[in-house]
C-alpha cells in the first residue's frame, strides 16, 4: 500500500531546489513532508491549512513537473494539512502498519525512550547525536558509533532511537540486534543453507541498530558478512547505529576495513555519571516506579554507587525490597543496612588473578593461553600489560609477580619498563591502560 515515499520526495526536492530561489523554497516548500504513496497518489502534508492553500495556489505545478522529472512517472499530487481528517486517517493507518513491521523485525524495550533517559555531562553528546539520528535518519550522522562501559545507557539510547522513529516517521523498517544474535543467526543460516534469507533480513531495512559490536572481533566470517551488510545499507542511504564498550581503534582483531568504516560518521562516548547526574537518575527511577524516597537516601546511594546506571538503579530497588520485607520505613539507616554488602564490596581486593582475568576479557583472549608459554604478539603483549598493572596496582614483590605468570622477576622488570616507556609515546595505549585500571578497581 505504501511506496518508498521518502526517497522519492527527496529526489523531487532536489529538482525543486534547482528551479526555485532559496527564499521561496525555505519560506513555503521546506514545510512539506512526504506522507505516503497510495495507488500512484503522492500524499504530502503541511502544518496548517494556510500553508496548504499557498502551495496549492502557487507551487503545485512546480511540484508536478519536478515529480515527473525526478521519477519519470506521472504521480497525482495531493496535499493535506495536519488538521484534516484524511491526514489523520492515513497517518493512523501508517502507524499501525509500522508497528506491525517493527515488532516483526525486532523487539524494543518500551521503557527505553528518550523521555526516560537522564541527560548529564557524561552522556550529553551521545544523547544529542542519537536524537539527531532519530529525527533525520541517514542525514545527521551515519554511521553513529557510541561507546562506553557496561550499564551506562548505550542500549537505552539505541532502543530510544527505534521508538522515536516508529512514532514520528512513517514506513521505516527498524532492526535492533546484538552482535551475538547476528553471529548466531549467521551460523544457523550457513548450517541450514539459508544465506540469502539471512542477507535479505538484514539488508532490506531502513535502520540497523547493532549492540555490542566488540563481540564480532576474532569472528572472521561474521566480520565478512557484517562488512557487506554495512556497505549495502550505507550505499542505500540507510541509517546504521553501532554500540561498543570501547572505540573502534581499541577493538582488538577487528578488521581494518571495518574499523575505518565505523569511523566514517560520528563517534560519541558515554562516561560514568557524575554525582549530579546520579542523583537525577535516582529521582527519575523513583518517580517512574512511584516510590517515595527521602533525599538523604538518594544522596547516600549516589555517593556510594559511582560505577554505572544499572548498579545505581539496582541499589535503589534493593532498598525498596528490604523495606517491604522488613515492613520498615525507608530512611538513611535502612539504606545503609540494605547496601552494606554492596558498599563494602566496592573496595575489592586487587589480585594478580583479577588483573589477568580483566586483561584477558579486554583483549578477548583465553586465560589458559595467557598463562601458557605462547609468545605470539596477541598474547605476549597483553601479558606484558598485565605484568605492568600487577606492579602498579599490587604490593607484591617482583619475584612474586613473576611466579604468578610462570616467569622470573627479570621478565617482569622488562615488561614494566617497556610498557612504562610506550605509555608516554602512545596515547591509545595510555587510554587502554586507564580503562583497564578502572575495570580492575571495579568502577
From Swiss-Prot:
SMART domains referenced in this protein's UniProt entry, alphabetically: AAA, Bac_DnaA_C
Main localization category: cytoplasm
Keyword annotations from UniProtKB, A to Z: ATP-binding, Cytoplasm, DNA replication, DNA-binding, Lipid-binding, Nucleotide-binding
GO cellular component: cytoplasm; plasma membrane
InterPro entries the UniProt entry points to: AAA+_ATPase, Chromosome_initiator_DnaA, Chromosome_initiator_DnaA-like, Chromosome_initiator_DnaA_CS, DnaA_C, DnaA_dom, DnaA_N_dom, DnaA_N_sf
Localization annotation: Cytoplasm
Binding sites annotated in the UniProt record for ATP: 151, 153-155
GO BP annotation list: DNA replication initiation; regulation of DNA replication
Region entry Domain IV, binds dsDNA, spans: 324-443
Keyword Zinc-finger attributed: no
Region (Domain III, AAA+ region): 107-323
Region entry Domain I, interacts with DnaA modulators, spans: 1-73
Single GO MF annotation: lipid binding
Region (Domain II): 73-106
Binding partners and assembly: Oligomerizes as a right-handed, spiral filament on DNA at oriC.
UniProt cross-references to PANTHER family, sorted A to Z: CHROMOSOMAL REPLICATION INITIATOR PROTEIN DNAA
Domain notes per entry: Domain I is involved in oligomerization and binding regulators, domain II is flexibile and of varying length in different bacteria, domain III forms the AAA+ region, while domain IV binds dsDNA.
HAMAP family registered for this protein in UniProt: DnaA_bact
Biological role: Plays an essential role in the initiation and regulation of chromosomal replication. ATP-DnaA binds to the origin of replication (oriC) to initiate formation of the DNA replication initiation complex once per cell cycle. Binds the DnaA box (a 9 base pair repeat at the origin) and separates the double-stranded (ds)DNA. Forms a right-handed helical filament on oriC DNA; dsDNA binds to the exterior of the filament while single-stranded (ss)DNA is stabiized in the filament's interior.
Entry's family note: Belongs to the DnaA family.
Name the record gives this protein: Chromosomal replication initiator protein DnaA
Source organism (scientific name): Thermoanaerobacter pseudethanolicus (strain ATCC 33223 / 39E) (Clostridium thermohydrosulfuricum)
Primary gene name: dnaA
Amino acid at each position: 500500500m505504501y511506496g518508498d515515499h521518502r526517497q522519492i520526495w527527496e529526489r523531487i526536492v532536489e529538482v525543486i531546489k534547482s528551479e526555485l530561489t532559496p527564499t521561496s523554497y525555505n519560506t513555503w516548500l521546506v514545510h512539506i513532508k512526504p506522507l505516503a504513496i497510495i495507488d500512484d497518489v503522492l500524499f504530502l502534508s503541511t502544518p496548517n491549512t494556510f500553508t496548504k492553500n499557498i502551495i496549492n495556489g502557487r507551487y503545485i505545478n512546480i511540484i508536478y513537473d519536478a515529480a515527473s522529472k525526478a521519477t519519470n512517472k506521472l504521480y497525482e499530487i495531493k496535499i493535506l494539512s495536519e488538521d484534516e481528517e484524511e491526514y489523520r486517517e492515513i497517518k493512523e493507518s501508517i502507524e499501525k502498519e509500522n508497528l506491525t513491521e517493527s515488532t516483526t523485525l525486532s523487539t524494543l524495550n518500551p521503557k527505553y525512550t528518550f523521555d526516560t533517559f537522564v541527560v548529564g555531562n557524561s552522556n550529553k553528546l551521545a544523547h544529542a547525536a542519537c536524537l539527531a539520528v532519530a529525527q533525520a535518519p541517514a542525514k545527521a550522522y551515519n554511521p553513529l558509533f557510541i561507546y562506553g562501559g557496561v550499564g551506562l545507557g548505550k542500549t537505552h539510547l539505541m532502543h530510544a532511537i527505534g521508538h522515536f522513529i516508529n512514532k514520528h516517521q512513517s514506513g521505516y523498517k527498524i532492526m535492533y540486534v546484538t552482535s551475538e544474535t547476528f553471529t548466531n543467526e549467521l551460523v544457523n543460516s550457513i548450517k541450514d543453507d539459508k544465506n540469502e534469507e539471512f542477507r535479505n533480513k538484514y539488508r532490506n531495512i531502513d535502520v540497523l541498530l547493532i549492540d555490542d559490536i566488540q563481540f564480532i572481533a576474532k569472528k572472521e566470517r561474521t566480520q565478512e558478512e557484517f562488512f557487506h551488510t554495512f556497505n549495502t545499507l550505507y550505499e542505500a542511504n540507510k541509517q546504521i547505529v553501532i554500540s561498543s564498550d570501547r572505540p573502534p581503534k581499541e577493538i582488538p582483531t577487528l578488521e581494518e576495513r571495518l574499523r575505518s568504516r565505523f569511523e566514517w560518521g560520528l563517534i560519541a562516548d558515554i562516561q560514568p555519571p557524575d554525582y549530579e547526574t546520579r542523583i537525577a537518575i535516582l529521582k527519575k527511577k523513583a518517580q517512574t516506579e512511584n516510590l517515595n524516597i527521602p533525599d538523604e537516601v538518594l544522596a547516600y546511594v549516589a555517593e556510594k554507587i559511582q560505577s554505572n546506571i544499572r548498579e545505581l538503579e539496582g541499589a535503589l530497588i534493593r532498598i525498596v525490597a528490604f523495606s517491604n520485607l522488613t515492613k520498615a520505613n525507608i530512611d538513611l539507616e535502612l539504606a545503609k543496612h540494605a547496601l552494606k554488602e554492596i558498599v563494602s564490596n566496592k573496595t575489592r581486593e586487587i589480585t594478580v588473578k583479577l588483573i589477568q582475568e580483566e586483561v584477558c576479557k579486554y583483549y578477548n583472549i583465553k586465560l589458559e593461553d595467557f598463562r601458557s608459554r605462547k609468545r605470539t604478539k596477541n598474547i605476549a603483549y597483553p601479558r606484558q600489560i598485565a605484568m605492568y598493572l600487577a606492579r602498579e596496582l599490587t604490593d607484591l614483590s617482583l619475584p612474586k609477580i613473576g611466579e604468578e605468570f610462570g616467569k622470573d622477576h627479570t621478565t617482569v622488570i622488562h615488561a614494566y619498563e617497556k610498557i612504562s616507556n610506550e605509555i608516554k609515546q602512545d596515547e591509545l595505549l595510555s587510554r587502554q591502560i586507564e580503562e583497564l585500571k578502572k575495570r580492575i578497581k571495579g568502577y
